[in-house]
Regions:
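Non-catalytic cap/lid and distal C-terminal segments of serine-dependent acyl enzymes
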Residues: 1-163
């Protein structure tokens, strides 16, 4: 949990401070969780765990269950870093549900080399069941797990996230 506390308690406040100091903003308009590959996994986890801090999410080619790293092992720490698992059990009356429903999030994955879209689809089904409007998008079989595609996907989705 140290990584979460570092980002929430140190990195985001520093971003807010710098945005005010350098841009004259009284408050940072919003922090979007963004990442590719393992960064996408972290972006989704940060956004889902703290939508009060992160106003949106763009995640490209992530894996959203801890099963890939931990197999069938599960303790509280693993559970809290496995979005498929904790969102499956997320209570409908939790205050974060309203935040999820009023923010923009995109989760995208290709189907080409080195991509693993199965957990993306697991999250899609969970979001649909909970009426959380996340844009879950699967790109073609030619779209591989690599930077050239992530550049294209970022350019494609960022206007939606920022709009």
């Amino acid at each position: 949990e140290q990584w979460l506390h570092y980002i929430v308690d140190e990195a985001v406040p520093k971003l807010r401070y710098l945005s005010k100091e350098r841009n004259g903003w009284d408050d940072l308009p919003g922090v979007i969780a963004f990442g590719c590959s393992l960064g996408a996994t972290h972006a989704v986890n940060l956004y889902l765990r703290r939508p009060d801090i992160f106003c949106g999410c763009l995640a490209l080619s992530g894996i959203y269950t801890a099963h890939y790293g931990f197999g069938d092992y599960m303790d509280e720490l693993v559970y809290m870093n496995s979005p498929v698992d904790y969102m499956r059990n997320f209570p409908e009356d939790h205050p974060y549900m309203e935040l999820y429903r009023n923010q923009k999030a995109v989760i995208c994955c290709g189907q080409g080399a080195w991509e693993q879209p199965d957990t993306t689809w697991m999250l899609k089904r969970i979001f649909e069941a909970k009426n959380i409007p996340v844009w879950v998008d699967l790109w073609g079989h030619d779209v591989k797990h690599d930077w050239d595609w992530w550049y294209k996907q970022t350019a494609y989705y960022m206007p939606y996230i920022l709009g």
